[in-house]
């Protein structure tokens, strides 16, 4: 989808202009799986890459983070399930095109084990991207269904932060601010996807609530 919409080309054009070599892996569809991670890792190793850029929703970014973990260590992604990832992973840049998952700003990634049909959680500082580029204009090309679903996802995250047992006065301020902005601007984003103000407020509430 990111290739079709031209979003990947926006990134590769910049790499070309700066003389950077790269390879593109664009076969992440739906929820990220161990097989997608293996395929991405194979390209990473074969092309002798040394950094990663993930662009898209939560699935491509989660896949990038998992590839980075295995690239920095040995074995397969299954070996890291439930473990704290503190190893120094390759540099990662996350460019989210949806507003709800928060994958670009968290120390977690979830990958499906296709053989056991379970979701594997990886967590730790090694899973955190080095840079997140939150450009609201990327969300303008998303289908309405994605805008609604990811917006509600962001609302759930903010509500969870506000009701958490570990909540603090500062996190309450962030969470309430995010909830108010989502209720105000998400309907506008849904009906007017090119409304820059509404899209910006909705997209940028994600870092605020975190």
Q: Where in the sequence are the language-model features?
A:
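Glycine-rich phosphate-binding loop
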Residues: 52-62
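Buried hydrophobic packing segments
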Residues: 40, 63-68, 158-159, 179-185
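A glycine/threonine-rich phosphate-anchoring loop and its flanking beta-alpha core
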Residues: 72-170
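ATP/NTP phosphate-donor binding region
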Residues: 1-51
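Conserved small/polar residues in nucleotide/adenosyl-binding loops
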Residues: 202-208
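Short Gly/Thr/Asp-enriched flexible loops that form oxyanion-binding sites at enzyme active sites
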Residues: 60-73, 105
């Amino acid at each position: 989808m990111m290739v079709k919409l031209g979003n990947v080309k926006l990134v590769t054009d910049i790499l070309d202009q700066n003389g950077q070599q790269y390879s593109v892996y664009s076969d992440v569809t739906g929820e990220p799986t161990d097989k997608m991670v293996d395929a991405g890792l194979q390209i990473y190793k074969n092309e002798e890459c040394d950094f990663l850029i993930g662009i898209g929703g939560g699935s491509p970014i989660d896949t990038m983070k998992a590839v980075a973990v295995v690239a920095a260590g040995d074995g397969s992604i299954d070996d890291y399930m439930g473990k704290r990832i503190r190893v120094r992973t390759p540099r990662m840049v996350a460019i989210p095109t949806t507003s709800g998952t928060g994958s670009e700003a968290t120390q977690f990634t979830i990958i499906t084990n296709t053989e056991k049909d379970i979701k594997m959680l990886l967590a730790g500082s090694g899973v955190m991207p080095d840079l997140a580029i939150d450009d609201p204009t990327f969300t303008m090309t998303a289908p309405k269904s994605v805008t609604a679903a990811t917006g509600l996802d962001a609302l759930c995250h903010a509500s969870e932060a506000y009701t958490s047992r570990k909540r603090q006065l500062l996190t309450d301020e962030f969470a309430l601010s995010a909830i108010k902005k989502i209720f105000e601007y998400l309907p506008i984003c849904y009906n007017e996807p090119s409304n820059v103000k509404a899209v910006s407020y909705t997209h940028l509430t994600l870092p605020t609530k975190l």
